[in-house]
């Protein structure tokens, strides 16, 4: 029974990291789309969004998907985009 629990836990970890990886790409696309529509935010906010989006992409490419999603969600929050 312990082996079954262990296998289930490992499977969950493997699949959840893949879900984060996919989430990054979706969030980056949402940010790009929102920025292309010239949202009603200040230039300082737009710069912060671009910075967070770039940071999220770098983290994604390094395989740090949880951190990437966190940065991207901050950008989406500034843009007022639902996640």
Predicted segments, located by residue:
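Bacterial N-terminal signal peptides that target proteins for export
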Residues: 1-7
């Amino acid at each position: 029974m312990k082996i079954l629990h262990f296998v289930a836990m490992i499977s969950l970890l493997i699949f959840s990291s893949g879900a984060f990886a996919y989430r990054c790409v979706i969030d980056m696309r949402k940010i790009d789309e929102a920025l292309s529509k010239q949202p009603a935010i200040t230039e300082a906010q737009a710069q912060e969004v671009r910075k967070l989006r770039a940071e999220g992409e770098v983290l994604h490419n390094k395989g740090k998907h949880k951190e990437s999603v966190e940065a991207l969600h901050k950008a989406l929050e500034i843009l007022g985009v639902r996640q």
